[in-house]
């Protein structure tokens, strides 16, 4: 596994944990929510840009993406 792939995995895990904390969810529920409403797909596709942004900006982007795809948080 490449170093970039490992960094991407760590970053996505961090985003899931922070999303869970922000919305008072368990990490498992946050993962399921982000998966269902395309937040994880967004992070995977836009990792190169998103990991350079402040974490709060990424969290706001995730919330917006999920809401556009039917999420209600």
Which positions does each model-derived feature cover?
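Short hydrophobic/aromatic-rich motifs at helix boundaries and adjacent loops
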Residues: 1-3, 33-34
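N-terminal acidic leader/helix
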Residues: 2-28
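N-terminal, charged low-complexity regulatory/assembly segments
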Residues: 12-15, 43-44, 62-65
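Alpha-helical structural motif
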Residues: 12-15, 26, 39, 54, ...
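Amphipathic, hydrophobic secondary-structure cores in small proteins
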Residues: 20-22, 26-52
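Long, compositionally biased
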Residues: 48-73
């Amino acid at each position: 596994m490449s170093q970039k792939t490992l960094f991407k995995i760590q970053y996505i895990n961090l985003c899931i944990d922070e999303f869970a904390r922000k919305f008072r969810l368990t990490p498992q529920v946050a993962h399921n929510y982000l998966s269902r409403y395309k937040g994880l797909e967004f992070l995977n596709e836009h990792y190169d840009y998103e990991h350079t942004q402040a974490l709060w900006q990424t969290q706001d982007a995730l919330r917006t993406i999920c809401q556009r795809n039917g999420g209600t948080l």
